[in-house]
Amino acid sequence: SKVSNQQITDLVNLLTFVADDKTVQLKEGVQITDEIKDTISQYKSGGITKDNRGVLDEYYTDEKLVNAVRNLIKDNFKGKTAINILEPSVGMGNFLHAATDLGVKTNITAFEINDTTAKITKLLHPDTQINLRSFETEFVTDNGTKKDFTPQYDLVVGNPPYGSHRGLYLGLGEEEKITRYEDYFVKRSLDVMNEGGTLAMVLPSGWLNRAHKLTGAELTDAYRLPNGA
C-alpha cells in the first residue's frame, strides 16, 4: 500500500534520533525489518529543505548508474584491508551501493542536510555514519572560523548538488572563488582524500570544461551519460 511522505517522516522519527554531535542514531532496540525498508524507500523527494535548497539539490541516483560506477572502481583497493569512504551529499543513500562488495572492510561517513532523508539513509545503511549537517561544516564553523582538516578518505563517491554556490557558507568565506556547488564538492572532497585515493562522482558535463583547474588530482576516466539519464 502507498504511504505518504508524512507517514514516512513520522516512522523514521519513531525509529531514529539525532545525537548532540549531529549524527543520526537508531533508537535502542530498533530492528530494521524488510517491511520498514520497503516503506521508507517509497519516500519521494520534493519541497524545500530547511536550508532553503530546493528539490534541485536532492538527487536520487539511478541504480544502473551506481552499479556502473562500482564496476569502475572495484579493483582500485587491492592490497588494502580497510578503506575510509566519504559521501558528501548522501540523499537517500543510493550511491552508497557503489561502495559495497569492494573486497575490503569499509568505514563510511556521509553528510545530508535533509532531516528525513538522513534518517531514511541511516535505516537503510545502519553501519554508515550519517551526519545531519552540510559538508561545508567540515571546513568552517557557523561564525565563519576556518576549521583544520586532514586527508582521511580513500574513496569519495556521490552525485553532489549542481548549480550556483550560494547560501550561508559562501557568506562565511568558505571557498568564495568557487562559484558552483559541484566544483566546491569536488575541490573539498579532494582536500580530505588520501594520496592515491579515488573520487567517483556524477557531475554535469560542463564540469569537464573546468576540470583543468584541478590541482593535486588526475582525471583518469570520464563518461558522458545520455541526455535525461
Predicted regions: what is each one?
Residues 107, 133, 141, 151, ...:
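RNase H-like polynucleotidyl transferase catalytic core
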Residues 53-57, 167-178:
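Glycine-rich phosphate-binding "P-loop"
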Residues 81, 104-107, 152, 195, ...:
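Short loop/turn motifs at secondary-structure junctions
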Residues 1-129:
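Class I S-adenosyl-L-methionine
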